[in-house]
Structures are given as C-alpha cells and as structure tokens.
Amino acid sequence: EFMGKKTTFAEFMERIDRTAKAYLAMGIGKGDRVTICMPNCPQALDSFYALNRIGAVSNMIHPLSAASEIKFYLDFSKSKAILTLDQFYGKVAGILPELENKDTVLLVARIVDELPPVLAVGFALTKGRKIPPLPKKGNYVLWNEFMRVGRKRDLPLPKELGRFTDCASILYSGGTTGTTKGIMLSNLNFNACGLQTIAASGFAPINGMKMLSVMPVFHGFGLGIGIHTALIGGATCILVPQFNVKTYAELLIKKQPNIIPGVPTLFEALLRAENLENADLSCLKGVFCGGDSLSVELKKKVDAFLKEHNAEVQIRQGYGLTECVTASCLTPKDYNRVGSIGVPFPDTYYKIVKTGTTEEVDANIEGEICISGPSVMMCYMDNPEETEHTLRRHADGRVWMHSGDLGKMDEDGFVYFSQRIKRMIVTSGY
C-alpha cells in the first residue's frame, strides 16, 4: 500500500513481470547491474523484484547521496542503468558524462504517477511545484515510456529459475573495518533472513498482517525486513517514503499496523508525538528495534508508552549487520534480559572469539561476535582481501563472519553487544 493506493499480491506479480519485460527491452539481462537510487515507493519495489526475475542484480543506494558518491557507486558496481526520482534528476544527469560507462541509462520515475487521483492533484499543487521540470529533450527515459516500450516489445521472460546461490542485490556498508564496501547478497540470504525473522517473531504466521515499512530500501533493515520478510510472509507493506513523526503517528492511528520495525531515534520521536496521546495501539503484535543500540532507559520508556496505549507487547531489540542482510539475533517474545540483544535466529549460530583470532572464549567473557548461517553474505564485491578477513573457516568446519563488534554471550545463549572494535558514527537513514 502506498499513500492509500492498494496493490494485491496478484497485481504486484503482474507489475513485476511487466517491469521485468521493460528491463529486458532496455537490454538488461542476467548478471547485469542496475542502481536503484530511490526512497520507499512502488517503482523501487517493482524494480528490485523485476531485476531478480531476469537474473539481474539491484545496486541499492541512498537517494540523498552526493553526486560524487552516486558516481562512485555507479562506477564501482559497473551499473548499466540507474533508476531515480525526478527530483534527483539534475544531480544524477550531471555526473553521466563523467561515468566510466558512457552508455549508462538514466531512468526517471515520478511519485505522482503512483498516487491516487485526489492525492496526485494535491501533490502537483504542493510538493510537486518544488520539483524542477524535466528538460523536454534530455539524456533520460521516463518510467512510463520505459514501461510502454516493454509492453510493445513483449519479450519472453526467462523460463529457468534463478539459483539460491545467485546474487540478488548489492548493499553498502562501512564493512567490519570501516571503509565503504559493496556487500553481495544472494537469493538464499534474503529468503533465509525473511523466514528466520518470521520464525523468531513468536507470532507466526504473519499473512494478513500489516507492517509499517519506513526503514529505507537501501538499508538491509528496510529491504530485508521492512519489505522482503513482510511480502514472503503474506503481510501488507505500508510504504512510507520518508520519516516524519507527525505523518508516521497518523499512519499508526489510521492504518492500525501489526508490526513496526524502526531505529532508536524513531521510537524516541514517537514518545514525543502529541497526536498519539490518546491513541489505541492494541493492534501491535511486534515492535522491533535495530540499526543502533537501544539503551535500557529508552526501552523502559517505550515499554511504558506501549502499555499506556493498550499494546500487549514490549519493544524487542535485534542485532545484525548488512553482511547478513540485517538482523540475525532478537529478543524473544514476552521475555527480556536487561542489556541483551537477544538470542540468535533459528538456524543461525553465534560464537564469541578472542579478538583477532578464531579461538572461542568462555561464557560471559568479552570478545568479537562471530556469526554463521544461511543469511551470511556471499562476499564483498571485488574485494577478496576484505572478504578473507571477514569470512573465515574455523576449526569446526563452519564459515564464520567476523563482525568487528565486541560482545559476550551468557550460559543460556543470550548475546550482549558492547561496541564496535573500530567505533563508527551511526546516523539515521534520512
């Protein structure tokens, strides 16, 4: 659901196939990379799944990135095309002549095309007026024209299914050592993350539930849980393109979602939202926090807030890295240990090792957090040295991802995060 416009699963599958045919008509095929430089909106989701449908790879980046950063991501990923919104046209068009691939196609979508008629008129008269008009002749392809060519050519979609080992998407992170890296995530990584998250939720199945999807699609948390977990579980994603506390609070009241994932700053803002004062939040089944540490004090405040508003749930902290899509550890339902980030997801293993080694330490001893399981990344793109440093085979025969985070595990398997080994500054998605 986007701005009140609803799409059924059957309609979404049709949209994916139509978008896949449009990418084929553009010349995109198996293994090709396309950059998606978009907020949470329908064209971004259509493209993410359509590219996967034809065996191509989505390269997910922040639409508010500086022009120089966008150039870096396009060159680094060897993208054949970039999808962005009309409001970012000038920034992206300006770097096209500087790209290594001079044939990179600029595909431009518009939010207004996906709005219900009444909202579309309102948008055109308000926010739309602030968006500079696109040049009549320019080095870009409008989304609607792109889709029209796809319909006209009507190329057959590939019959062979993708493999679980195929790369689905590239996300970016400071990695476990602090420098920007492209993280190659497979079909298995995304599907495992989704199934594990649902299993760990404690309230499966989630079909028919509603998730307020505000975490951005260029982050593992937003894409892996806010979108993919919800969709493979049969839940509705209510897409929120940008966080604004007043709008978000209104959506909570109006849409009555069952699941809300967010970062600590989002929940801090909700505590101050005046329009939630008398809200009934008994609809909530899962309130999940990740992306940064949830302080003991903030957890107490949010739990009290939820109770005051008739919600029978606690805020549950998760932990993970983009190197395993997103979360791989979660506070159990109806249970909490103070300061803990929870227990590992089903089919995922955690161990704590002496920093700089593969030697496991005893319970309650601090060391580096290591993770093994089906959501662990394929590799860092074109960076075998960092991949080798991060993914290591231990004496037990398993490949373990060394997180670069310090923590400990108690006798019952509850994990506690301390800090980054190389402390990095963490900011919100927008």
Language model features: what each stretch is:
Residues 257-262, 271-338, 349:
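Gly/Ser/Thr-rich phosphate-binding loop
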